[in-house]
Structure formats: C-alpha cells, structure tokens
Amino acid sequence: EMCIRDRPDSEDETFEGIDLLDPTKLVPEELAEVVLVGKLTLDRNPTDYFAETEQVAFHTGHLVPGIEITNDPLMQARMFSYLDTQLTRLGGPNFAQLPINCPHAAVNDNLRDGMHQTAIHQGMAPYKPNTVDDDQPELATEAEGAYVHLPREVSGPKVRANPVSFDDHFSQATLFWRSMSQVEQAHIVEAYTFELSKLFEKPIRERVLGVLANVDAELCARVAAGLGLPAPEGDPARGVVPSPALSQVTTEVGPVAGRVVGVVAGPGADLAGIGRLRKAVEAKGAVLHVVAQVGGELTKGRAKETVERTFLATRSIEYDAVVVAAGTVANDPRLVVLLQEVFRHCKALGAWGDGAAVLEAAGIDTSAPGVVLGDSVAKPFTADLLTALGRHRAWDRAV
C-alpha cells in the first residue's frame, strides 16, 4: 500500500513543535496519520542484474510537477550528491537514456554527445538563446507539462549554525526506545552489548553508557550489566509519550504469499502428507521446498517428491518456517543445526506424526509458541501452521 502523511505548510516549517527541517527528528504517526493514496505493485523481478540493477540511477531530483523539495539541508545536499554519484558511476549525464532509467516520454534535453548518447540530434545549437537555429529548441511551458518551481519568499540572515532543535539529542531516542515491544527492546540491548563487547578500550565503553543513560535508565542498566560495568546516572527526557506505530512487532496475522516453507523429509517420509501440505501452502501463494539429506527424488508407493534443498547446501535463512514430515529420522547434525537456528530465530516450526521426535531430538521445546504439531496433515494442522507463518515470528518465544 502507498501512503502519505500530509502536514500544513507553516512559515516556521514546524509541526506540533517539531522542526520539520531537522532530519534527526520524526513526527509520530499518532500526530500525523498515514493516509492511503494507492497501491504500488511489483509485478516482476529483474531478468538482467547488470542492465536493470547495476545501472539503475536513483535521484532525489526526479520529481513530477506538483512535488518540490523542502529546505531540509540534508535533502539539499542529497540533491547534489545523487546527481554527482550517477555522473561518476554511469560515465556522464546521459544516464537517463539507459533503458532502466529511460522515462516513458522520450528524453528531450540539450545534452549532446558523450557516453550513452543514443540520439542523433538535428540542428547546430545545443544551447539557448541562439540565432543559428532560430532560438530553438524552445523550453516546454507549464501547459505542456513542464516542471515549474513555485515562487517562495525568503528572508532572514544566513548563518553557519543549526536551529535550536538540533541541540536536543535524546528525546527522540527516548521516544523510540519506549515505543518498542519487549522483544524489540531485548534486541536493542543485545545489539549494544554485542557491539560494545568488541571495544577493548574501557573508557569508550563507559562514554557510550553515559550517552545511553540520557536515553533511558533501564536501557543503560541492561547494557551495563551485559558489559559488567556500573550504570552511570543520566538525565533522560521527561514527558515522552510512546508511539506504538514505531514498533514492528504485531500480533495480527498477515498474508503468507511469497513466504517459503521447508519440509524436512527422509527416505521413509510421509510423501502423501507432504503433497497435501504443498497444496495447502501453495493455495495461499507460499512456496514449499522439500529438504533432505541428499538430492534427487523421494518415492513411496505412487507418491513422489523432488528434493529442492539438501542439508549440506541450505541454512535457516532461506525459510520462514520449517516442518518435519512423519517418517523422518534425525541422524544428521546439520539437520539439528537447521532446526535449532529456526527455533532460535523465532520462526514457525512444525511436525506431524513421529516427526515431532526429530524436533525433540534437536532439543526443541515442542510446547513453545509457534511450534505446531499434528497427527497428520489435516486441515487443523495446516491452518495452525499458516497462522503461525502469517504472524511472521513467534516473538513470545524470545521474551
């Protein structure tokens, strides 16, 4: 879904006391709601990585009439740096003529020659004004769809200084921390503790803790405990109202289209059950991969399944959920690693029949949230698995 947030244009360029030109500040969604204006649909992937990915030229100055940039100094700098980057990366100003960057309308400018120039221009004067070509080409008018800058009045002294809001270094960090769920806060603490553990200079660790103390006392104390250091006192911002919209953790069940389910199977696995699970998963737009010790095909009676991944050549990062089929034997340490990683990353896990014994042999707590068990691949089992998959992660497992 494509959404925007609309705020009134004020002379002081602030909203609810927040400086809109300060890139270190954000406006909580609770103060300026998100408005749905349409949907952007990605209908295909690149087919040529070089032509369509390496040569793409993003540029903040690629605007349609009616949209202008603000006086944000960071944005102003990006207007220069993006163009400068494309000139360097793609060999000159004609990057708009590369197929991936070419607009639907023909490129019609005064740029001549150089790398990537594909047009054969008529006339003698690639500039204006001129006399030799009767002052042509003529600039497009607003009626013809040209980009027009709206006139704006500018006044006041120009100084090399930042607005006073730039001196507030901590209130929005405090807002962010206090808006996180328990599991997100745990991730933040672990991230700080991990990175600071790589610092071998104790004074630097202590200085960072001093900064965190001004964000939130609990955050500082938890990181300090992980480092084995005392937590200093700080002065966190007061009266900060959390913004639940900042949290990415949700209890809602989302769509599963495009997600990948790995089904672990052995030579004696229930292939008919795998077939039923595949049908249920693919009906929702998800993908199922059979994972086994060796490649090739698994056969049992009339049922047949192709092995898409092997224990040697796969890792948990490829899957949003992993299910162990009945009839599978846990006799490979690589399978144990796969299952433990999926469990540790709070992804959905499942098993039917004696496949549950494989989870238990890997040290998986089968009563934990997001672990789905069943006697067979019946509707209740597939429904519970798709629900767990739609929740993305079983975050309760990490708290």
Stretches with model-predicted labels:
Residues 163, 182, 186, 190-344, ...:
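Extended, subdomain-level signal for the structured scaffold at the beginning of enzyme domains
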Residues 345-352:
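ADP-ribose/adenylate-binding Rossmann-like module
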Residues 6-254:
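Charged, compositionally biased interaction regions
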Residues 45, 354-355:
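Short, loop-centered acidic/histidine patches that primarily coordinate divalent metals
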Residues 2-4:
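Short, small-residue-biased leader/transition segments that mark boundaries at the very start
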